[in-house]
Amino acid sequence: MQQRIINRVEGDPHYQQYLQSFEPEHDQSAAAAIILAARQIARTVGAKAIVSFTVGGSTAQRASKKRPDVPILAISPVEEKARQLALSWGVYPDVAAPGSIDTDDFRGMLSFACETALAKGLVSDPNDMIVVTAGFPFGTPGAANIVRVVPASGPTTWDASL
C-alpha cells in the first residue's frame, strides 16, 4: 500500500519541481555544487546510477536530499556509516572491505565503483553510464570535489559514441 502511494507521488511530473520549491538557500560549498552537478549530469547522460565514495556519509546524504532520478550507491569503508545510509532515500550502501580501495589509484576506484554497481544490480548493461563522486583527500568529511562519468564496463573502455 505505502509503495503504491510513494510510486504515485514520485511519479507525478511536478514532483521534482514541488520539492525544489521548498529548498532553502543553496549551500555555496564545492561539495554541494558537485552533488547538484552529479544529479544534473545523471539526468543529461541518462546514467543509471550515482556512485558516491564516502567515509562519513555526508556526500551520499546530501545526494539523497536532492532526490535524483537514479539510485545512489554509497561505498564506504565504515560499516556503521553504511548501515546509517541504508535509511537515506534512494541510497544503496556497500561496505568496502579493508584494502579493496586504493585511494591513490583513482582509475582503480572507478573500476571498483563499476564492479559494485553491476554486482548490486543497479546497472545491467556494460554500456550503462554511471556518475561517480568522490572527495580528495579521501576521508575528509564533506570534501566531495570530483565528479566523473564512466561506463559500467569500466574507465578503460570509454567509447566516444556513448
Question: Model features per residue range: what roles?
Answer:
Residues 33-47, 109-124, 128:
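Phosphate-interacting basic helix/loop segments used at nucleotide- and nucleic-acid interfaces
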Residues 59-61, 67-107:
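Nucleotide-binding motor/catalytic cores of P-loop/tubulin-like NTPases across gene-expression machines
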Residues 1-39, 162:
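Long, charged amphipathic helices and adjacent flexible linkers at domain junctions
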Residues 48-51, 70-73, 92-94, 128-131, ...:
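Structural motif
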Residues 115-138, 144-156:
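C-terminal binding/interaction regions
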Residues 46-67:
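Acidic/histidine-rich
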Residues 28-36, 57, 79, 103-111:
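Electropositive phosphate-/nucleotide-binding environments in soluble metabolic enzymes
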